[in-house]
A protein has these predicted regions:
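Residues that define the transmembrane beta-barrel architecture of outer-membrane proteins
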Residues: 27-31, 81-85, 98, 193-197
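Residues on the lipid-exposed face of transmembrane beta-strands in outer-membrane beta-barrel proteins
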Residues: 33-37, 48, 87-91, 199-205, ...
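Repeated loop/turn-to-beta-strand initiation elements of outer-membrane beta-barrel proteins
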Residues: 42-46, 85, 96-97, 207-212
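Glycine-rich, aromatic-lined ligand/substrate-binding cores of catalytic
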Residues: 190-224
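Transmembrane beta-strands of outer-membrane beta-barrel pores
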Residues: 50-56, 91-93, 106-112, 205-207, ...
């Protein structure tokens, strides 16, 4: 059950997710290695961790055709590998009534699909996302924008016949047939950042304290509606 509706004073219930008798538990294997260091009687600390995690029978909310009466079905769609590095540097400093605790952390996390259901090459999951072996989950799969047509003379004849004019967007014609359609979609980046981190500081003086926390991430793609 996934949705409800009131009609003529009566409560209704609608099914949005189809059942799956073949559904299996995910299976995961993970390896970790790390190091913890402390200097100057604990005033400075450093932690480093690395991990690799392989997941099989990956669970995913797979879209289903609207003609089925459902919007999605939970399926085992393939296998995935996650790997990453995490570093934390900490400081505990103080003198008299004053103390300062600081932590800086940064993480580099990657994932990629290593196998797909029924050996499919690609599985489209929405109008702008798809799953493909070797690509990260969370990748954008869409037609690539290249700029703006400055004049009608630039426009290929077939595209001009479709009503495209100067001032309209230029999209990359992947298959080279002068027709922009679903076959021209490609992977254009990932919503997953290359690295994330945070910087935390707590200052204390007698009965007063001040805390500040900053977070950051870099090089992830965003889609604007």
């Amino acid at each position: 059950a996934g949705g409800g509706y009131n009609y003529n004073g009566e409560n209704g219930l609608g099914l949005t997710t189809a059942g799956n008798r073949d559904l299996k538990w995910e299976k995961a294997q993970q390896g970790d290695i790390g190091v913890d260091l402390s200097f100057f009687r604990g005033a400075i600390t450093f932690t480093a961790d690395a991990f690799i995690k392989d997941t099989k029978d990956l669970l995913y909310q797979k879209p289903t055709p609207a003609t089925s009466g459902y919007t999605s079905q939970v399926c085992n769609i393939g296998s995935m590998r996650n790997k990453g590095l995490e570093f934390t540097l900490g400081a505990n400093l103080g003198k008299g009534s004053f103390s300062w605790h600081s932590d800086f952390n940064i993480s580099f996390i990657r994932n990629k699909l290593t196998a797909l259901l029924d050996n499919n090459e690609i599985l489209t999951t929405s109008s702008m996302h798809a799953l493909k072996v070797g690509e990260p989950i969370g990748s954008f799969y869409m037609i690539k924008w290249k700029g703006i047509y400055q004049s009608d003379d630039e426009i290929p004849a077939k595209i001009y016949d479709q009503g495209v004019r100067a001032g309209d967007c230029i999209y990359e014609d992947v298959d080279g047939n002068d027709v922009i359609d679903e076959n021209d979609k490609q992977f254009v980046g990932s919503a997953n950042p290359k690295f994330t981190g945070g910087f935390n500081n707590t200052f204390k003086y007698k009965g007063f304290d001040l805390s500040m926390f900053f977070t950051f991430s870099s090089d992830n793609k965003l889609y604007e509606l």
